[in-house]
């Protein structure tokens, strides 16, 4: 089918209208959020650890189709680089570098919502039209989602949880290392690994961080994809995540270990691996949701 060359002015006007429509729909979604907290409970499925292999395979397939590593390379890596550079000049920030980066496990479910939408759109196009549409523009459809307000509200809860984690991390540092900051990165590393207080900081800090990560995982493992996929209440989405984790403790624990291990391995080579690990895990989360929540069998 022949395509006509459009007037650039007309194209810009249409794009502005589309964005305005998305903003308007987002506003209506925010109003809808306040009156739609709980809805009918949903059925959750039992899965096995072996199912996680299929989930990761499909996530990697979406990653290769969209090449979302480029998005993370453009957006995420410069942020991490700026953080490291800032820490190198302001030594008081050094103790927060690890908590800030490791806290991505808390914010990850919210940050990944755009990639969930990309996987959802690709899945729909393959099923309905047998077309592999993998445009980056699919990510922008999140702003027009009927549950956009609920997604943002749940995301803000994770942001609050992330900030609480940073406050706890800083409090633990001061409790174990004193109120003064290290004079250099080398001094910080020395105090961390060669003093009793440093080892207490590592042990207790990892334990507290683990609790924050588990809380984020259990409450949001399917919540964000569910809000993208169906018109359900925010409370129902969170409760469905909790029920899915309760019904599948071993697979969900294994998934949490995969996420943690992937983030650690991705961060080792100067954080470069995160531009691959993070988008693959985000895409895979959509397919994990598909495994855990049946499409047409609600309770």
Task: Give short role names for the model-derived ranges.
Residues 1-299:
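Hydrophobic alpha-helical membrane segments
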